[in-house]
Structures are given as C-alpha cells and as structure tokens.
C-alpha cells in the first residue's frame, strides 16, 4: 500500500472515526483503525468499530498502490494531528521482513514515523442492511430533534432502552423523545423538503409505521457528523431488526438498535393545568446560573416561589453551613401562587434546549409533573418532576 494525502483530510477523518474505537477492546484489532486504499477510485477509507458502534469516512487521495492495514487508533491520531499541514505519505513495504510486514511508514515534510499494525483481515466487517428502502432525512430535522431531546437520555446502562432516543413518525414530522425517569424531552421536527422537481422528498406515508430507539452515544456522533452540513442536505437512514445505518456523503455510521418497548411517554404528560407562568427564558437561565453557585451540592435544589398578585417569580437556594441566595424576576402568572422545587441541573438542561426566548411553565398542585414549552418556533415539550419540599 502506498498513498499521498493531505494531512488535514487524514486528521479530520481519524478524529471522526476514532470515536467508535473501544476504550477497552476485547480484541487488539478493535483498538485499531482500518485503512483501505483504492488505486482505481483514488480514495482512502477509514473505519472504526467496537462491535456496537461503527463509523466510516472516505476522502480523495493519490493512491499509488492499493492495500489494507489496521493501525493503533490513538497512536496514529496523535501523530497525524501533530504533523504540519501539507502532503503526507503512507506506505507499507510488502516485501519487508515477516516481523515487519505490517510496518507502516508515515512521511511528511517534518520527518518520518513508523507504526506497526495488525492484519486487516482480522478486522470485523461493518453491518449492512439489504433490501430496505432508505428514509431520506433533512439535516435540519435531525439537528432540531437531537438538540431538543438527546440530553434527556439516561446515562445509566442498567436502564437499557432509556439510554437511547425514541424516534417515530408523526404525520409529516419525526418525533424525538428521551427520558431518564426524572425528566422527559419530546420534540416534533418537521421533515418537509422538496427536490429539484418540487416533489416532497419524504411524505407522511413514509413515516406512518416508522419507530426506532437508537443509543444516545450513536446519536451524539451523528450530531457531530451533521454539524457542518447544510440544513437541506439529506441523510440516508436504513433500519432492520437489529441495526440502524446513517449515510451522509462519504460518511457512514452504524449502530445496534435498542431492544424492548419504549415507555408510553404520552401518558406522562398532563393535559390540564391549574397554573401557568410565562417568562423570559434567557433571564431565567442567567438567574439560575447565579443562584446555583450557592446551591447545596448534595441535593442541588432551587425553590420557585410564585407571587401571583405581583407577577414575580422568586428563585431561592440554600446551602447548609454556607449560605443562602435568591433572585426575583418578572413573570406573567395565571392561577394561585405557591412554591415548587427543582433539581437545578435538570431544569437548566431543559431551558437551554428550548428554542424560543419566551417560554411557558405549566403546573398543578403538589408534586405532579411540570411542563416547559417554547412560545413559538419548534414544537417541544420538556417535562421535569419537581422535588418534594420538606418543611
């Protein structure tokens, strides 16, 4: 194998795929990146796979001799990322000694490095899905859905299906939902986009029976992949009984599906409320950021006091043996006043994801779920469970 490529192309490709390399590989080759050079098509393809998540990326290179090799992911990335911008050469001597048959030489204008790899034939193939019509999703749909829901997925691996985001068709939109048992985020992201002939790329019939739960880890990598793309660019998605595959240009992401029925989250959302508070989102966030400095690290609570006659919302925190902090802000309050407490982190996560400046908080008496929604813009619901106050 011998090729010449740009340092920037190889470095960005390695940064992307290396995120699918296992930190504790069950086999040495899973700690490596697979490099495949094709002289006929003049491209270099990079692949990483931890048997659950796989990422593949290709780019143009001057391939003088085709070949395949796997190289240690972290070592290769550390070297290439530090090389100066410009052309670099990767070469393997096929006639080398038996012990050096996988020795790869990396040459740049600054110097020369040699890395010993492992046989490419030992690297597991990425899963494929055959005979399934791909769903073409606008990047804007994925960006909106993931930005509004991904943060609420559970990080507790024992909760299995809750460590993912549930995505399902809803009319001409995709509904993204995530919950960790303490909060729930639901986003309805429109999919309407037309091709050059003015025809809808995706229709309600395409989404009618679509539903899948995908690990949050895989979707975070997808979010990074599409971040630099245009909103009208299309991502291909195919799903079978066990796998999901996203493709965008020369990039591909594969992931296992999460098995099991996702909770019926619609039933958790109250339909009627006794109190409604309308307020400015950014003002609330900055007030929370200030008072959170004094929040008790053990429970991380903030108490909201609704002062209905005066249309004031008071925020208060208490840290035992440290002190007390409070702030007030204007708010439009409909219904009786009262007190309610929240975990500050859960509250802040949701407020930062809401897409509009003016938001509404809807609540009932006692410790029933509280709903936050944006006024205008994207249709999003953020449900958070309040914390019981002990007098």
From Swiss-Prot:
Domain of life of the organism encoding this protein: Bacteria
Entry's family note: Belongs to the beta sliding clamp family.
Main location: cytoplasm
Keyword Cell inner membrane attributed: no
Entry's Gene Ontology cellular component terms: cytoplasm; DNA polymerase III complex
GO molecular function ontology, one term from the record: DNA binding
Subunit relationships: Forms a ring-shaped head-to-tail homodimer around DNA which binds and tethers DNA polymerases and other proteins to the DNA. The DNA replisome complex has a single clamp-loading complex (3 tau and 1 each of delta, delta', psi and chi subunits) which binds 3 Pol III cores (1 core on the leading strand and 2 on the lagging strand) each with a beta sliding clamp dimer. Additional proteins in the replisome are other copies of gamma, psi and chi, Ssb, DNA helicase and RNA primase.
NCBIfam families, A to Z: dnan (TIGR00663)
One BP term from GO: DNA strand elongation involved in DNA replication
Compartment(s): Cytoplasm
Keywords: Cytoplasm, DNA replication, DNA-binding, DNA-directed DNA polymerase, Nucleotidyltransferase, Transferase
InterPro entries named in the record: DNA_clamp_sf, DNA_polIII_beta, DNA_polIII_beta_C, DNA_polIII_beta_cen, DNA_polIII_beta_N
The protein's role, per its UniProt record: Confers DNA tethering and processivity to DNA polymerases and other proteins. Acts as a clamp, forming a ring around DNA (a reaction catalyzed by the clamp-loading complex) which diffuses in an ATP-independent manner freely and bidirectionally along dsDNA. Initially characterized for its ability to contact the catalytic subunit of DNA polymerase III (Pol III), a complex, multichain enzyme responsible for most of the replicative synthesis in bacteria; Pol III exhibits 3'-5' exonuclease proofreading activity.
Annotated protein name in UniProt: Beta sliding clamp
One Pfam family it belongs to: DNA_pol3_beta
